[in-house]
Design a protein with these regions (language model features):
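Acidic/histidine-rich, surface-exposed loop or edge segments in extracytoplasmic proteins
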Residues: 27-38, 84-93
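Loop/turn elements at helix/coil->beta-strand transitions in domains of secreted/extracellular proteins
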Residues: 27-30, 60-65, 115-121, 176-181, ...
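A short beta-strand-loop element at or near the start of a globular domain
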Residues: 32, 48, 103-104
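Terminal, contiguous helix-loop blocks that mediate binding/assembly
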Residues: 24, 137-437
Length: 437
C-alpha cells in the first residue's frame, strides 16, 4: 500500500479528541466528516466547514467531531472541532487522491484512533452518483459513469478526476468500527445497490436519491442534531433539518425547495432482497426479464416514465438508469404481488422526503430547471418538460433508487453497466442473473 507522506504540524496525543475530565472513559459518539472537495465544490466546502465550526458550539459535550478536509487551495488536513474551536491534528505534505481506498482507509483509521468512542457515525461530503461503477475509479470518457468522491489529486478544480466505487467504499468501511449511521451529502447516493453493499457497516444509511445543491446541508443547525442520543429518531431529525426551512437552497435557487432524500434501516435489506427476488420471479417468463419503465399515458399530462434520478451520461443527458424502486415495481407487478412486496420496502425505508410534483406547483420544484440564471446554465434533466415525464406522489415515490437492466446500457455506459452491476451483491441476490441478464 502506498503510504501517504505527511507533515505533523502539532503535537499529537493518543486520544486527541478526548475530554480530559473523562479520564479513561470513552466519549459517547465520534462524528467523522469526510470532505472530498479537491474539485469544483471546493468553495462550497469551505462555507460548510465554517458552518460546522458554528454548529459545534451546540454539539453535545459527550461527542467528538473530527473532520478531514481536502480542498483545491490547501494541502489535505485533519482537524478536531470543539465548542467553536478547531485544532489541526495532521497536515499532509503533499496532495493525493482522497478517493483512493488506501488513502481513505488510512485517514479514517487515523480519525478513529485519535477520537475513540463507544459509537461512530460518518458523513461523506462531495460528488456522488450512487451505484454507478467506474474502471479502477477513473472516468476518462464522456460515457463514463462514476460513484463517490471525485478528486483531482492536486490543488486544482479541474483535471483528471478519480472516484471510488461504492463496492470499494464498503470494503473500506468494513475495516472500521461499526457505524450508527453513514450519511452522504452527495448526489444520488441512496440506491438499493449501495445500501445493500454497506448494510453490514452501518445501522442506517441517509442519502439523497437525486442531484443536490453544491452548497450542501446547513451544518450550523445539522451538527448539533448529529449528537442527539435517540438513534431511532435521529435519521428523521437529520432529514427534516436537511430539507427544512432553514436550508440555504431556496434563497439561491428560487424554484428549489426540497430534494428526494431518505433513511434506510440496513437490518431490513436482506428481507427486502428476498421479497424482491420473489416478486421478480413472478414476472419471469423466459429469455430476459424486461421491466417496463414507461407507464401508459392516458392524457398529455400523464407521466410517460417511472421516476428516475440519473442518466447514462450523467445527470443531464443520456438514458435514465437509476429509477425509483417503488415506482418500477408498482408499474410491473400485479396488484396482489405489489401489495405483498411493498411492506418490505416500507420497513427498509424508514423515512423519506420529496418535493411537490410539478403538476401541483406549476414550476420545476426539484432544482433550477428552465431558468439559466439560477446557476448560470439551464439544467435540461430538471426542465419542466423532463419533470413532467414522471409523477412524484406518495403512491409513486419510495425513497430508494435501483438499476433497471436495459440493453441500451451496453452501448451507452463505460464500463458496460449490464456487466458492472454484477459487482454488487444486490444484483445476484435478487436474481438478475437468473432472469436472463
Amino acid at each position: 500500500m502506498k503510504k501517504i507522506i505527511y507533515l505533523l504540524i502539532t503535537t499529537l496525543f493518543i486520544t486527541a479528541c478526548s475530554n480530559d475530565d473523562e479520564g479513561d472513559s470513552l466519549i459517547r459518539r465520534t462524528i467523522m466528516i469526510y470532505f472530498s472537495a479537491e474539485n469544483n465544490l471546493s468553495s462550497y466546502a469551505s462555507e460548510d466547514i465554517n458552518e460546522i465550526i458554528v454548529g459545534s458550539r451546540s454539539l453535545a459535550a459527550d461527542c467528538n467531531l473530527i473532520v478531514f478536509v481536502d480542498l483545491k487551495s490547501t494541502k489535505p488536513y485533519i482537524m478536531s472541532v470543539t465548542n467553536g474551536e478547531t485544532k489541526v491534528l495532521k497536515t499532509y505534505g503533499s496532495d493525493f487522491y482522497a478517493s483512493s481506498p488506501d488513502n481513505m482507509l488510512e485517514i479514517l483509521q487515523y480519525m478513529v484512533s485519535q477520537c475513540p468512542a463507544r459509537e461512530y457515525a460518518t458523513i461523506f461530503w462531495g460528488h456522488g452518483t450512487g451505484s454507478i461503477i467506474t474502471n479502477d475509479t477513473v472516468a476518462n470518457t464522456s460515457a463514463s459513469l462514476k460513484a463517490y468522491g471525485a478528486d483531482t489529486g492536486s490543488d486544482t478544480s479541474s483535471g483528471s478526476e478519480k472516484w471510488i466505487n461504492t463496492t470499494t467504499l464498503a470494503r473500506v468501511m468494513s475495516q472500521l468500527p461499526h457505524q450508527q449511521f453513514i450519511m452522504f451529502d452527495a448526489c444520488c447516493m441512496q440506491t438499493v445497490e449501495t445500501a445493500y453493499e454497506l448494510r453490514n457497516t452501518t445501522d442506517y444509511l441517509i442519502a439523497p436519491l437525486c442531484e443536490t445543491p453544491s452548497f450542501g446541508g446547513n451544518y450550523a443547525t445539522l451538527v448539533p442534531i448529529l449528537g442527539h442520543t435517540d438513534i431511532a429518531s435521529l435519521p428523521r431529525e437529520i432529514i427534516d433539518d436537511y430539507t427544512g426551512s432553514n436550508n440555504k437552497w431556496s434563497s439561491v435557487a428560487k424554484y428549489f425547495s426540497n430534494v428526494c432524500i431518505s433513511a434506510v434501516k440496513t437490518s431490513q435489506l436482506d428481507a427486502l432482497a428476498a421479497a424482491t427476488y420473489t416478486a421478480l420471479r413472478s414476472l419471469y417468463a423466459g429469455n430476459k426479464l424486461r421491466l417496463s419503465t414507461n407507464p401508459a399515458a392516458a392524457s398529455a399530462d400523464d407521466p410517460t416514465s417511472c421516476i428516475y434520478y440519473f442518466k447514462t451520461r450523467g445527470l443531464r443527458a443520456g438514458y435514465p438508469i437509476l429509477y425509483d424502486m417503488k415506482d418500477v415495481m408498482r408499474n410491473n407487478l400485479s396488484a396482489e404481488a405489489y401489495q405483498a412486496w411493498l411492506p418490505y420496502l416500507e420497513r427498509a425505508v424508514i423515512y423519506k422526503s420529496r418535493p411537490d410534483d410539478i403538476r401541483t406547483t406549476g414550476v420545476c420544484d426539484w432544482f433550477g430547471g428552465d431558468d439559466p440564471n439560477v446557476f448560470g446554465y439551464p439544467l435540461p434533466m430538471f426542465s419542466s418538460a423532463n419533470f413532467r415525464s414522471f409523477l412524484l406522489s406518495d403512491d409513486t415515490y419510495g425513497g430508494l433508487a435501483m438499476i433497471v437492466p436495459q440493453d441500451i446500457y451496453s452501448t451507452n455506459t463505460e464500463p458496460d453497466m449490464l456487466q458492472a452491476m454484477f459487482d454488487y451483491q444486490w444484483t445476484s441476490t435478487v436474481g438478475w442473473n437468473s432472469w436472463g441478464w
